[in-house]
Curated annotation (Swiss-Prot):
Cofactor: Zn(2+)
Pfam families in UniProt: Histidinol_dh
Positions of Zn(2+) binding: Q255, H258, D356, H415
Name of the molecule in the record: Histidinol dehydrogenase
Cross-referenced SUPFAM superfamilies: ALDH-like
Catalytic activity: L-histidinol + 2 NAD(+) + H2O = L-histidine + 2 NADH + 3 H(+)
Functional pathway: Amino-acid biosynthesis; L-histidine biosynthesis; L-histidine from 5-phospho-alpha-D-ribose 1-diphosphate: step 9/9
Organism, as annotated: Bacteroides fragilis (strain ATCC 25285 / DSM 2151 / CCUG 4856 / JCM 11019 / LMG 10263 / NCTC 9343 / Onslow / VPI 2553 / EN-2)
Keywords for this protein: Amino-acid biosynthesis, Histidine biosynthesis, Metal-binding, NAD, Oxidoreductase, Zinc
Length: 428
């Protein structure tokens, strides 16, 4: 961990810099895989599964028998936890339903919007070092609430060709339509272009490593939409002298164990807290099963001491963290001044873990500073809003002359004429 005390503003850009990956060769590799899947379909996807996931497959689809068998393998306490999380996620996302209303912008001119679900969506759930069944809930539940007709899920199998039981249980519970054994770039390509088994979708959601991220970026250039750009997961804890160092250390470690490239940062006005957190992190590390991963992540973590809360807020908004935990005595007042963050956790008893799993908010969030321009996944991510307008003769009489003037000044004669012929008809 790097202890930084009272950094000058000229140092902020360097301090807040995220790791940058060399992507030129990566994109070439990813593009080649995408092109091969696009041309070869299921056969090529299964070839890549054998190479990357060491799984020899004869088909990609997960069968109903496999899902039923998986349900028997999920412990009762985990099922209960997943049910609780599902209820809270449904409650929060159901409250986001769009209720469009008709607006009369002038007499005879009525405008409105209608929310329509994206018909086919693809969800990518990574394999790696942990089964992310929670991400299944975070993506499939709002898709189902939105009314998406087809929810396709791709996730890599283990070397025996099996998908983790908790992922299958969560997928069935959340309303996923079809599940396929496919991971990495090949899964993204399959959902973007379709194969004999895997349907083409209109939008792809879900996290992944740098190869998956690159694949999503490439297919989104012209062929399919994606949720958002993604990078390594990150947390910032913003704290003053009232914060509990045990809690702060636990929050930093909960982020660090995600992966070796995860970002964990403390910004505090208390030198005493900064010192105590260092001790607590070292103490709690000993209890972690993923200690090696957390230690590598913490090597690049930063504990930053600033002179006052005003400076802490400026630094935080400049960083735009994916997750922001505010542990200050006046956390609501501090939160009111946050303008750049993916998801904010308020007070000593609101850890990031709550949002990751079961509070109800979505954990699919903008990373890498994208919180300055992007929102996290919500119900809106799975819908489109179609605009309607109805113009009566009285409305055309009211706005028509202005349209004619504007069109003429943009030298768009046909635009002007489309109004002129109608005005002439009205005046007859």
């Amino acid at each position: 961990m790097k202890l930084i005390k009272y950094p000058d503003r000229s140092q902020w850009n360097e301090i807040l810099k995220r790791p940058v990956l060399e992507t030129e060769n990566l994109f070439d590799t990813v593009r080649n895989i995408i092109n091969r899947v696009r041309a070869g379909g299921d056969r090529v996807v299964m070839e890549y599964e054998a190479v990357f996931d060491k799984a020899e497959l004869t088909s990609l689809a997960v069968t109903s028998a496999e899902i039923e068998e998986a349900e028997k393998e999920v412990p009762i306490e985990l099922k209960a936890a997943i049910y609780l999380a599902k209820r809270n996620i449904e409650t929060f996302h159901s409250a986001q339903r769009f209720e469009g209303k008709k607006v009369d912008t002038m007499e005879g001119v009525t405008c409105w919007q209608k929310a329509v679900a994206i018909e086919k969506v693809g969800l990518y759930i990574p394999g790696g070092t942990a089964p992310l069944f929670s991400t299944v809930l975070m993506l499939a539940i709002p898709a189902k609430i939105a009314g998406c007709k087809e929810i396709v899920l791709c996730t890599p199998p283990d070397k025996n060709g099996k998908v983790h039981p908790a992922i299958l249980f969560a997928a069935r519970l959340a309303g996923v339509s079809k599940i396929f054994k496919a991971g990495g770039v090949q899964a993204i390509a399959a959902m973007a272009y379709g194969t004999e088994s895997i349907p083409k979708v209109y939008k792809i959601f879900g996290p992944g490593n740098q190869y998956v991220t690159a694949a999503k970026q490439l297919v989104s250039l012209r062929d399919v939409a994606i949720d958002m750009p993604a990078g390594p997961s990150e947390v910032e804890v913003l704290a003053d002298e009232s914060a509990n160092p045990v809690f702060v250390a636990a929050d930093l470690l909960s982020q660090a164990e995600h992966g070796v490239d995860s970002q964990a940062m403390l910004v505090t006005t208390s030198e005493k807290l900064q010192t105590e957190v260092v001790y607590e992190v070292e103490r709690q590390l000993g209890y972690l099963t993923r200690r090696d991963i957390a230690e590598k992540s913490l090597a690049s973590s930063k504990l930053i001491l600033v002179k006052d809360m005003e400076e802490a807020l400026e630094l935080t908004n400049a960083y735009a963290p994916e997750h922001l935990i505010i542990e200050t005595k006046d956390y609501m007042e501090v939160a009111g001044q946050i303008v750049n963050a993916g998801s904010v956790f308020l007070g000593a008893f609101s850890p990031e873990s709550a949002g990751d799993y079961a509070s109800g908010t979505n954990h699919t969030l903008p990373t890498n500073g994208y919180a300055k321009a992007y929102s996290g996944v919500s119900l809106d991510s799975f819908i489109r809003k179609i605009t309607f307008q109805e113009i009566l003769p009285s409305g055309m009489s009211a706005i028509g002359p202005a349209i004619e003037v504007m069109a003429a000044n943009e030298h768009l004669d046909a635009h002007k004429n489309a109004v002129t012929v109608r005005l002439e008809e009205i005046r007859k």
